[in-house]
Design a protein with these regions (language model features):
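Short loop/turn segments immediately following the C-termini of beta-strands
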Residues: 34-36, 145, 153, 196-198
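Short loop/turn segments that connect beta-strands within beta-propeller blades
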Residues: 102-103, 163-165, 217
Length: 219
């Protein structure tokens, strides 16, 4: 027995996992958010056993896509609702970054977040920087100077946006994904940004083991 249903937003959010960034000086909340549907199925114990489904405790790292629910008559499978081309079954954008006015609670800007540079039909990277809007995992940092700095998207870029308008100010390609929030600080009168560039195996972004730093010009 198998009962299927679609979930939208999917299990990965809305705005789950990454959290939000707050700019109290300008009264803004910044958030990267998903538009990715999931398909989940209620599956009988017999079929789960036939599929070789294991819980995380039984097989760490091998439970992706299964909700085993040991001791129950049913478990579940779940995952993004994908086409035969290995692309989501709805049109892009699949992810946005948005600015919200905390006083009025209105979305003052929103734009697709992430390109298809490392993604495409059948898993073939498109190598284009068209902002299709990808799912993302991770958050960023909003500075007092009105800049939001964030990696998180599937295309291995880190970006800086104008927090008040959403204008893209800067971006740089990374050797792996940045799924952890960047850190910013000032030392000797100069502002720095530091990010862990380690990737994530379940997004997936490219894995790495780097810590990278950037600084504003001294003048």
């Amino acid at each position: 027995m198998c009962i299927r249903d679609r979930v939208y937003p999917g299990h990965h959010g809305g705005l789950n996992w990454g959290g939000v960034m707050v700019d109290p000086k300008h009264g803004l909340l910044l958030v990267n958010n998903q538009r990715l549907p999931y398909m989940q199925s209620l599956v009988s114990r017999e079929k789960l056993d036939a599929l070789g489904a294991k819980s995380f405790q039984e097989a760490p790292g091998q439970s992706k896509g299964f909700r085993v629910q040991q001791g129950q008559a049913y478990g579940a499978t779940k995952g993004p609702w994908m086409s035969v081309l290995d692309q989501p079954c709805i049109a892009p954008p699949w992810g946005y970054i948005s600015g919200i006015d905390l006083r009025t609670r209105e979305v003052i800007w929103s734009r697709p977040f992430g390109t298809g540079y490392d993604n495409g039909p059948m898993g073939i990277p498109s190598r284009t920087q068209w902002e299709i809007g990808t799912p993302s995992d991770g958050t960023g940092v909003a500075t007092a100077g009105g800049v939001t700095i964030i990696g998180a998207a599937l295309d291995q870029f880190i970006r800086a946006f104008d927090s008040q308008t959403g204008e893209l100010l800067w971006q740089q390609r990374l050797p792996a994904g940045n799924q952890a929030a960047p850190l910013t600080y000032i030392a000797n009168g100069r502002q720095y940004v530091v990010a862990v560039v380690g990737g994530h195996d379940r997004i997936p972004t490219r894995l790495g083991d780097s810590i990278m730093a950037w600084a504003l010009p001294q003048k």
